[in-house]
Design a protein with these regions (language model features):
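Transmembrane alpha-helices and adjacent helix-loop boundaries
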Residues: 1-268
Length: 269
C-alpha cells in the first residue's frame, strides 16, 4: 500500500511540475492522429476506387495495361506499408530521403514529416478497407447504375461509396485510435508528441515509472473518449429506431399516378 501512495505522490509531483509539457504532447498527438487519419482516408478512398475500376478483354490494350500497372503499384504500396513497422518507415522516409538525395530532399518541418509518414501508413490500411467495402456492395447495384448510363465514377460517387462508407466507418475509427497510440514512435524523428514529452521528463528527473503511469492513463483516456464518440457517430448514421411500417401495398396504391411538384399526386390517363 505504501508503494501505491508513493506512486500517487510522485505522479502528482510530476503533473504539477510538467503539466504544460504533458498537455502540449497530448495536443500534438491528437492533432497528428486526426489529420493523418483524415488524409489517410482520402488516400485509401483513392486507392480503393482506382483498384476496382473494371476492365475486360474487349477494352483497348493501353487501358488494360495501365489499369494492371496501377493495381500492381497499389498492391506493392499496401504490402510494403502494412508489412513493416511504422518506426522503420519513419527512419527510411525522414532520414533515407536526404541520404539518397544528398540532402536535396529533406524535411524542414518535423510535423509535416510526421504527418506524411502516419498518413501514408494509414492510407495503406484504408485502401484494403475501402476495397473490401466496395466489394461488399451487391453487384446488382453497379449493374443497375450502368444500365441507366452512369460512368464508373458516377456509380462510385452516387451509388457505391455512400453505402461502402457506412460499412467501413468502424475501421476508420479503429485507425484513428491506432494512430493515437502509434504516433508515439514519432519521437524517432524528433516530433514532440505525448510519449516524447515523457522521454524528456524522465531524462530530467529519472522518475520513469510514475511518468509512464501518467502516460498510460493519458493514452487510455484518449482512446476511451474516441471510442465513445465513434459509437455515437455510428448510432447517428444508423438513424432512428422508431418508425411506422406502411400499411397496404404501396405499389398498388401508386399505380397510375405521378407526383407533381405543385399539384401533388395526379392520375395518369
Amino acid at each position: 500500500m505504501d508503494k501505491f501512495v508513493k506512486l500517487g505522490q510522485d505522479m502528482v509531483l510530476l503533473w504539477s511540475k510538467y503539466k504544460v509539457m504533458y498537455w502540449a504532447g497530448i495536443w500534438n498527438t491528437l492533432k497528428l492522429a486526426f489529420l493523418a487519419t483524415l488524409i489517410g482516408c482520402f488516400i485509401g478512398l483513392l486507392c480503393g476506387v482506382l483498384n476496382t475500376i473494371p476492365y475486360t478483354k474487349k477494352d483497348p490494350l493501353p487501358k488494360r495495361f495501365l489499369l494492371k500497372l496501377l493495381r500492381i503499384i497499389i498492391r506493392i504500396y499496401v504490402e510494403v506499408f502494412r508489412g513493416t513497422p511504422m518506426v522503420l518507415q519513419s527512419v527510411f522516409i525522414y532520414y533515407g530521403l536526404p541520404y539518397f538525395s544528398n540532402n536535396a530532399l529533406r524535411f524542414d518541418n518535423i510535423f509535416a514529416a510526421a504527418l506524411l509518414i502516419v498518413a501514408i501508413n494509414t492510407g495503406a490500411y484504408m485502401a484494403e478497407s475501402v476495397r473490401g467495402g466496395i466489394i461488399s456492395i451487391d453487384p446488382g447495384q453497379t449493374e443497375g447504375a450502368k444500365a441507366i448510363g452512369m460512368t464508373h465514377f458516377q456509380t462510385m460517387v452516387n451509388v457505391i461509396m455512400p453505402q461502402a462508407l457506412r460499412n467501413i466507418m468502424p475501421q476508420i475509427g479503429n485507425n484513428y485510435i491506432i494512430n493515437v497510440k502509434d504516433t508515439s514512435v514519432m519521437f524517432i524523428i524528433g516530433f514532440t508528441e505525448f510519449f516524447a514529452q515523457h522521454r524528456y521528463i524522465v531524462g530530467v528527473n529519472n522518475m520513469y515509472f510514475p511518468s509512464a503511469t501518467i502516460e498510460m492513463i493519458g493514452y487510455l483516456t484518449l482512446t476511451l473518449i474516441a471510442s465513445l464518440i465513434l459509437r455515437l457517430v455510428e448510432k447517428l448514421m444508423d438513424g432512428s429506431d422508431s418508425y411506422e411500417l406502411a400499411q397496404g401495398d404501396q405499389l398498388v396504391m401508386a399505380a397510375g399516378t405521378y407526383s407533381h411538384p405543385d399539384r401533388g399526386t395526379c392520375l395518369l390517363y
